[in-house]
């Protein structure tokens, strides 16, 4: 597990995000923090991140805690997390249907996502790591230090 946590720390440090004036947009980091909060609290127990209000509420709460401004919609980082190697969508129909939802670079609306995405899920190893307090804490520290320390 030690080698794998290093891989996921590196993946978190290298999230595909917008950078302006040397600052990384924190949207994906806040979403991951929210997912880890849900795992810690027992809202997520089966590696299924659903398109529902619980993740939305957690994202908005964490955004206000760490960024202290009006939060954007959670569905933008939820959609764009598909660029990360550890984040996956479980399709209602086919993965090709998900790929056809929007043009490259665009964000699918919540309605479109709900028609094609049953839920998102993490690599099993990553999910196992964040279920453990020590692993979750290490990954949270990476996100908070890299994305939120200058706020």
Language-model-derived ranges and their functions:
Residues 1-151:
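Intrinsically disordered, charged low-complexity linkers and terminal tails
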